[in-house]
A protein has these predicted regions:
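C-terminal engagement/docking regions of AAA+ P-loop ATPases
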Residues: 78-157
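Conserved AAA+ ATPase core "coupling" helix
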Residues: 1-61, 65-73
Length: 157
């Protein structure tokens, strides 16, 4: 997929394969399901009102100028890192801030910390960067290069 399209996906989460028992459960759940009626079997897990309330909470998370700068520095560093051929776009910076808000909410805080940003960075950046051929020949992964990059950026206090 072209880089511009990949950049529109919020995150890349690597799940791996299910255990044998779990795969059997998946097969059993769907083996007699009529594919045309599959969408009817999907259950609502959240009400619109609850979703709006959660979005309102996310909009109330305090994001200091230091956190904004830190997120931007991380993404900007992907554009200058020697092992990265193509770095993250401004869309990556926005995604990093927005997902770090969720990390703060899950930690039951009304403010963002550097740890929220650092935690989300691999999920946000791993599909938005392209490693250099040399880095790939070394066997490096996007996640390893992102961790290396995070260690080079001063964490705000």
């Amino acid at each position: 997929m072209p880089e511009a399209q990949l950049d529109r996906f919020l995150m890349k989460i690597k799940l791996g394969y299910p255990k044998l028992e779990d795969e059997i459960k998946i097969i059993n759940r769907f083996k007699n399901t009529n594919q045309k009626n599959l969408s009817k079997s999907i259950k609502k897990i959240i009400k619109k009102k609850t979703l709006k309330e959660l979005m309102d909470i996310a909009n109330q998370i305090h994001i200091s100028d230091q956190m904004t700068t830190y997120a931007a520095q991380i993404v900007h560093a992907t554009r200058e890192h020697g092992k990265i051929y193509l770095g993250g776009s401004p869309r990556a910076s926005l995604a990093l801030i927005n997902t770090a808000k969720v990390a703060a909410i899950l930690a039951e805080r009304d403010f963002m910390t550097p740890d929220d940003i650092k935690y989300m960075a691999p999920f946000i950046l791993n599909h938005r960067i392209i490693l250099t051929p040399e880095a790939e020949m070394e066997g490096l992964t996007e996640e390893e290069v992102i961790q290396e990059l995070l260690e080079t950026i001063e964490v705000p206090r």
